[in-house]
Amino acid sequence: MYLLIPAAGMGKRMGSNRNKLLLTLLGKPLLSWTLLAAEASQKIEWVGIIGQPYDFPEFKTILTTISFTKPVELIQGGETRQASVYNGLQALPKAADNVLIHDGARCLVTPDLFDRCAEELLTCQGLIAAISVKDTIKIVDSNQFIKDTPNRSNLWAAQTPQGFKVSLLKQCHEKGYQLGWQVTDDAALFEKCQLPVKIVEGEETNLKVTTPVDLAIAEFILKQRFTH
């Protein structure tokens, strides 16, 4: 299985002007933890890290420090996540039929989740890891008044990895570019192209580290893993 990791995010909500994946979590950059899970995965054979060239020296240092053994390529990202993933798709080895895309900021992902998604992708065209929503969700108008309360049993919170047939995802990206679609994940492109996307049970601990509170929670979860 081939894995693309978008890793170009700035840590503005962290109060930082540098790439948030280079911020430290238990003595290692966030990106290290994501890569360690990829290294331990039984299914992932190749990794592409999508970022900006000025971060590449630090990415290389991370790969050396954690003794990453799988083939890896550093790929220049675009102005948006969507553009970055498109660049990543173009850089995949020709042999790649299927691809997993995983946000580098979801640094608590486990090797098991990578492997389950990789296995499931052999039986479908597209999938995402997701968890059922526990909170009641409200839809509001521009004045912050509630318009509707959707049925919680139909709501799932999207995570990554998200996996797709490479040829289909390339077509979706090209169509999205031509029609000016702007989406926040690749599953949305698949949906707009009327293609099916399956849910794979994600992990509650697979949070996206975006704020200082997220960082503190991630630290707690990692410490629990090490003590058990």
UniProtKB/Swiss-Prot annotation:
Q: Name one GO biological process term.
A: isopentenyl diphosphate biosynthetic process, methylerythritol 4-phosphate pathway
Entry EC number(s) = 2.7.7.60
UniProt catalytic activity? 2-C-methyl-D-erythritol 4-phosphate + CTP + H(+) = 4-CDP-2-C-methyl-D-erythritol + diphosphate
Q: Where is this site: Transition state stabilizer?
A: 13, 20
Keywords linked to the UniProt accession: Isoprene biosynthesis, Nucleotidyltransferase, Transferase
Q: Does the keyword Methyltransferase apply?
A: no
Q: Which PROSITE patterns match?
A: ISPD (PS01295)
List, in alphabetical order, the Gene Ontology terms for molecular function in this entry: 2-C-methyl-D-erythritol 4-phosphate cytidylyltransferase activity
Q: Which residues form the signal peptide?
A: none
Question: Matching Pfam families, A to Z?
Answer: IspD
> InterPro entries given for it?
IspD (IPR001228), IspD/TarI (IPR034683), IspD/TarI_cytidylyltransf_bact (IPR050088), ISPD_synthase_CS (IPR018294), Nucleotide-diphossugar_trans (IPR029044)
- The highest taxon in the source lineage is Bacteria
Pathway-wise, it operates in: Isoprenoid biosynthesis; isopentenyl diphosphate biosynthesis via DXP pathway; isopentenyl diphosphate from 1-deoxy-D-xylulose 5-phosphate: step 2/6
User: Location of site Positions MEP for the nucleophilic attack?
Assistant: 152, 208
In which family does this protein belong, per the annotation?
A: Belongs to the IspD/TarI cytidylyltransferase family. IspD subfamily.
Function comment: Catalyzes the formation of 4-diphosphocytidyl-2-C-methyl-D-erythritol from CTP and 2-C-methyl-D-erythritol 4-phosphate (MEP).
Instruction: Note the PANTHER family from the entry.
Output: 2-C-METHYL-D-ERYTHRITOL 4-PHOSPHATE CYTIDYLYLTRANSFERASE, CHLOROPLASTIC
Question: What protein name does the entry list?
Answer: 2-C-methyl-D-erythritol 4-phosphate cytidylyltransferase
Q: Which organism is it from?
A: Crocosphaera subtropica (strain ATCC 51142 / BH68)
Lineage of the source organism? Bacteria, Bacillati, Cyanobacteriota, Cyanophyceae, Oscillatoriophycideae
